[in-house]
């Protein structure tokens, strides 16, 4: 019942979930003593303890520093590689290149592009979505992935009022 204490099996499941996301060492730390990234990993572990087939993440990297963003994205990618279906919302198109096999761009609640990240996260699509000029470049030097770089220019569409950013 909902008022009972966790069983040994419950504790084992919780510890396994903490291990999966790489924070088993935080098992006994009070939640008030966790960083933002540790807290976010704890929330993902809590969801994993329910043994879901699908996990929906709404901006799991928001308000996190770069290091914790990468840690979260690595966990997301690892869980997906193990077969967990993940639906993740993000305002950072780069995240699709790091953690997605399929991605979509939504505009005013409507899906306007869907497919592999290389097909969807393009300069043209991002310019239309955000109303600014965005460069999508392949980064080498040991990284070998694409990244998005917003310029400081409004798109020509934005200047004429023809963008979709409403």
Roles of regions detected by a PLM:
Residues 90-91:
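H-loop/switch region of ABC-family ATPase nucleotide-binding domains
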Residues 30-34, 38:
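Conserved ABC ATPase signature
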Residues 130-166:
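ABC ATPase nucleotide-binding domains
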Residues 96-98:
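A short, surface-exposed alpha-helical micro-motif characterized by mixed small hydrophobic
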Residues 8-26:
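Conserved ABC ATPase "signature" region
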Residues 55-58:
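Catalytic Walker B motif of ABC-type/P-loop ATPase nucleotide-binding domains
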Residues 51:
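Conserved catalytic motifs of ABC-family nucleotide-binding domains
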């Amino acid at each position: 019942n909902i008022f009972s204490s966790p069983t040994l099996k419950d504790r084992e499941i919780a510890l396994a979930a903490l291990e999966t996301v790489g924070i088993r060492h935080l098992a006994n730390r009070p939640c008030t003593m966790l960083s933002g990234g540790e807290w976010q990993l704890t929330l993902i572990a809590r969801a994993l303890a329910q043994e879901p087939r699908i996990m929906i993440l709404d901006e799991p990297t928001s308000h996190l520093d770069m290091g914790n963003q990468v840690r979260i994205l690595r966990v997301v990618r690892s869980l997906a590689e193990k077969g967990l279906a993940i639906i993740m919302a993000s305002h950072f198109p780069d995240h699709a290149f790091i953690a997605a096999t399929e991605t979509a761009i939504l505009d005013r609640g409507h899906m306007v592009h869907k497919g592999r990240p290389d097909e969807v996260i393009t300069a043209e699509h991002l310019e239309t979505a955000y109303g600014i000029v965005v460069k999508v470049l392949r980064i080498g030097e040991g990284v070998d992935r694409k990244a998005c770089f917003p310029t400081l220019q409004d798109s020509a569409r934005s200047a004429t009022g023809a963008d979709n950013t409403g």
